[in-house]
UniProtKB/Swiss-Prot annotation:
It is found in: Nucleus. It comes from Mus musculus. GO terms for biological process: negative regulation of transcription by RNA polymerase II. Belongs to the NC2 alpha/DRAP1 family. The keyword DNA-binding applies. InterPro entries: CBFA_NFYB_domain (IPR003958), Histone-fold (IPR009072), Transcr_DNA_Rep_Reg (IPR050568). This is Dr1-associated corepressor. Residues 138-155, 196-205 have a biased composition (Acidic residues).
Length: 205
């Protein structure tokens, strides 16, 4: 049986591209082939950007591509000059041992982000959900920058968590100990006499 070549069919959605194009008032009708061609051009552009960024990452002996690697790639390649504004706020790479430093820097940042420490019981878990719902990467970057700077501002939010009702702990049940008093008990009152019992029977009948 001959082996079938699997057709590479992953593309940027042409309908979305057409919608973006039509937001420009100067563009009227768009031929069906145009968004498809732009979709393929986007793929080729991303492929070249990621290959260059991958080379930068590997040259640093890093296992994870970071925004700093992308920034260096964009600054080194003249064809990516138009992207420099996007990465202007990204921190520069540090020396050859940068992988260890960057990973070390990320650890404490994660610790300061809301909802990541063990003491907070998901009080700010909704922020993580909001990130998934945001539409563009730039919105996500803005939100991530906000969460980085809000780390110090999050500490005043501890008192609302203290407003939860305090936990009530029950102590283990104590064994029954019969009461023994050092004082003598008074004599028991006399019980009902036989005559009283007969009177009570009369009332019952």
């Amino acid at each position: 049986m001959p082996s079938k070549k699997k057709k590479y069919n992953a593309r940027f959605p042409p309908a979305r591209i057409k919608k973006i194009m039509q937001t420009d008032e100067e563009i009227g009708k768009v031929a069906a082939a145009v968004p498809v061609i732009i979709s393929r051009a986007l793929e080729l552009f991303l492929e070249s950007l990621l290959k260059k960024a991958c080379q930068v990452t590997q040259s640093r002996n890093a296992k994870t591509m970071t925004t700093s690697h992308l920034k260096q790639c964009i600054e080194l390649e003249q064809q990516f000059d138009f992207l420099k504004d996007l990465v202007a706020s990204v921190p520069d790479m540090q020396g050859d041992g940068e992988d260890n430093h960057v990973d070390g820097d990320k650890g404490p940042r994660r610790g300061r982000k809301p909802g990541s420490s063990g003491r907070k019981n998901g009080g700010t878990g909704s922020k993580g959900k909001d990130k998934k719902l945001s539409g563009t990467d730039s919105e996500q970057e803005d939100e991530s920058e906000d969460t980085d700077t809000d780390g110090e501002e999050e500490t005043p939010q501890l008192p609302p968590q203290a407003s939860h009702p305090p936990a009530h702990f029950q102590s283990p049940p104590t064994p029954f100990i019969p009461f023994t008093s050092p004082l003598p008990l008074p004599p028991a009152p006399p019980g009902p006499s036989a005559a009283d019992a007969e009177d009570e029977e009369d009332y019952d009948s």
